[in-house]
A protein has these predicted regions:
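PRPP-associated nucleotide enzymes
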Residues: 1-139
Length: 139
């Protein structure tokens, strides 16, 4: 599209790996994260997403173009919350996801594909290798 952000904010946890990958791809080194809890298990959510600590310093976004990155726009509630929060201070906020679901309430600016399927990303379903070399199921 020709638009480039000054800063990329990944939605933790699912958006952190895509945010880093996009940062490398477009040469943006300024990265941030915002920690949001919404999904409690596969197909189970809180009533509304909540922002958890530590919180992003939104005052540092003044005068900036910000790209918010998450893995999926499923219900769209998480992206809606984050984008609207960051719009309070940033000059411009756009959003990017890998997948968009048909029933989302929030249409991201950039999306790779649309699907109505549950998506299992390698970074969220494969066992974690711990410091002692053992495996622990992801969560």
């Amino acid at each position: 599209s020709g638009w480039f952000p000054d800063l990329i904010v990944g939605v933790a946890r699912g958006g952190l790996i895509p945010a880093g990958a996009i940062g490398y791809a477009i040469g943006v080194k300024a990265m941030g994260a915002i920690n949001v809890e919404f999904y409690t298990d596969i197909g189970q959510t809180l009533e509304e997403p909540i922002i958890l600590s530590p919180q992003l310093d939104t005052d540092s976004l003044k005068g900036k173009k910000v790209l918010v990155v998450d893995d999926v726009a499923d219900s769209g509630k998480t992206l809606d919350l984050v984008v609207n929060l960051l719009k309070e201070t940033a000059d411009e906020v756009r959003s990017a996801v890998i997948y968009t679901k048909p029933k989302t309430i929030f249409e991201p600016d950039f999306s790779w594909k649309k699907t109505d399927q549950w998506i299992n990303f390698a970074w969220s379903v494969l066992p974690v290798i711990t410091a002692d070399g053992s495996f622990k199921e992801g969560s």
